Design a protein with these regions (language model features):
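Conserved functional loop/turn residues at catalytic and ligand-binding sites
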Residues: 102-103, 114
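Glycine-centered loop/turn positions within well-structured domains
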Residues: 106-108, 116
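Walker A (P-loop) ATP-phosphate-binding motif of ABC ATPase nucleotide-binding domains
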Residues: 16, 91, 107
Length: 122
């Protein structure tokens, strides 16, 4: 199994949680209990700063780091990408290859790029 941790010293992974191969998980990420994360998922904790239009983007550095929190009993499909600071609520299902750009209520089923609410678990 191959996991990529940004230094890998400050990540919380709950009981009975599984992480697929090639997951990119930055420091500070909090993963709850009973989480299923598919392979090749990518969690961002920062982004390129592009706010100053008078300077090239490559010279603006990075935005402030934000922590991602994944609740309990969550299923994250393969190749899901999460923008910085996402909170995935308890009981949520994230369809494969989705791009999460915002947070959703508990027991949401979301999918797409950008991810949209499909329905709630019954």
């Amino acid at each position: 199994m191959c996991l990529f941790f940004a230094s890998g010293i400050d990540i919380e992974i709950g009981d009975y949680s599984g992480i697929g191969i090639n997951a990119h998980i930055p420091n500070g990420t909090i993963i709850g209990d009973y989480v299923m994360m598919g392979p090749n998922c990518f969690i961002l904790d920062e982004n390129h700063d592009i706010s100053d239009t008078t300077r090239p983007m490559c010279q603006q550095g990075m935005t402030e780091k934000k922590i991602t929190r994944i609740g309990n009993d969550v299923w994250i499909g393969r190749e899901v990408h999460m923008t910085p600071g996402r909170t995935i609520a308890d009981g949520s299902v994230i369809a494969m290859r989705s791009v999460l750009t915002k947070d959703y209520p508990p027991y949401s089923i979301v999918g797409g790029n950008p991810a949209k609410l499909i329905r709630y678990r019954k």
